[in-house]
């Protein structure tokens, strides 16, 4: 039904959000490491 379709869509968006968050955290971690090294 349409309810399951919406659930799938939300699931996919959630997956993208989690991937993006993980990427951002990784970049932030690298930036912190660079800042610590530069100091």
From Swiss-Prot:
Arginine amide, modified sites: 39
Any one Pfam family match given in the protein's UniProt record, by short name: Cecropin
Localization of this protein: Secreted
GO cellular component, one term: extracellular space
Family label: Belongs to the cecropin family.
Function: Sarcotoxins, which are potent bactericidal proteins, are produced in response to injury. They are cytotoxic to both Gram-positive and Gram-negative bacteria.
Name by which UniProt lists this protein: Sarcotoxin-1C
Protein species of origin: Sarcophaga peregrina
């Amino acid at each position: 039904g349409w309810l399951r379709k919406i659930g799938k869509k939300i699931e996919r968006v959630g997956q993208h959000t989690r991937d993006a968050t993980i990427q951002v955290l990784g970049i932030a971690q690298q930036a912190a490491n660079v800042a610590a090294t530069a100091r």
